[in-house]
Amino acid sequence: MGSPLQQLSDAGVAVWLDDISRQRLRSGNLAELIAQRNVVGVTSNPTIFAKALAEGDAYDGQLRDLAVRGVSVEEAVRLITAYDIRWAADVLRPVYEATDGVDGRVSLEVDPRLARDTERTVAEARALWWLVDRPNLMIKIPATVEGLPAITAALAEGISVNVTLIFSLERYRAVMDAFLAGLEQAQQAGRDLSTIHSVASFFVSRVDTEVDKRLSKIATEEAVALRGKTALANARLAYAAYEEVFSSARWTALAQAGARPQRPLWASTGVKDPELPDTLYVTELVAPGTVNTMPQATLDAVADHGTITGDTVRGHYDAARAHLDAVESVGVSMSDVVETLEDEGVDKFVKSWEELLDRVAQQLAAHT
């Protein structure tokens, strides 16, 4: 039977950890999670790095060296985060090799202040790719309107991409189109398509948080009964779209040339509502060929009491469509919800990035 996390892996879900810190790397904890908890990848974001630098003294030595060298705050942030990502990539390298490059992946985000700037996002992606210099790196690029052509351009250059901040089915389809366009351009340039990997990070819990807030405000019996179900419906229909696109003639031509599919990745899987089961966005989103990146608390919850019952996505498409229709019918505009979430998502990461810059600036000054 195996542990819940083993069962999840057996069902075709890659378990990734949504966290990184110098302390976790130095203590050997990441290696332990790989060995004991079926973890086969790591994601990071500005919020995670800001938290890591706020805790303990694991970064003091590097900060001291950077202060002596007189590097700028932005360059220091880039070097500190790249150091952790490179270390994590090396810890995960055996997984990368054992899975022929599918897993063993570590994701590093471009400066979120560039989310509405295509050209600078591509330049930043290129710079981070060169700086980290590991084949199992993925560069995180947001799925903003301006991010879409940046995704295509990065993939065309052979850079593996984790597309982040996807909330809507419409935008997810645009992301898959950007992915296919990038591979087509890479193929025209003579690149080996089998070395270019991508995941599409579809955010889950934030959808319920925003929709449920609006349903509670409407407060009718019908509206209240719809709470806690929209994120799953949205994600399940995203998987239906994935199945459709990756069975198309356009994709088949790329696959025959060695391309790997862009896997759906369930992100924001920590449950925010205490009335919902703390494993909800893992156990109810089991489908082959997906990734679920979990914060430590969610990983621990699934390991402790997660019940894996096989595929919980396919076979639920009609119910998912009916649910989203019902949400609209009681007065919640999903298009407004996802627009709000994208703006909030970018703003949240920008704020965390600025906190990270401030913290590093203070610590560099302390070591000067």
From Swiss-Prot:
Active site residues of this protein: K140 (schiff-base intermediate with substrate)
Localization terms from the record: Cytoplasm
Stored InterPro entries: Aldolase_TIM, TAL/FSA, Transaldolase_2, Transaldolase_AS
Signal peptide range in chain numbering: none
Pathway field: Carbohydrate degradation; pentose phosphate pathway; D-glyceraldehyde 3-phosphate and beta-D-fructose 6-phosphate from D-ribose 5-phosphate and D-xylulose 5-phosphate (non-oxidative stage): step 2/3
Keyword flag Cytoplasm: yes
One protein family per Pfam: TAL_FSA
Gene Ontology molecular functions: transaldolase activity
Protein's UniProt keywords contain DNA repair: no
Coiled coil: none
Domain of life: Bacteria
Assigned GO CC terms: cytoplasm
Protein task: Transaldolase is important for the balance of metabolites in the pentose-phosphate pathway.
Name of this chain's protein: Transaldolase
Taxonomic source organism: Thermobifida fusca (strain YX)
Gene expressing this chain: tal
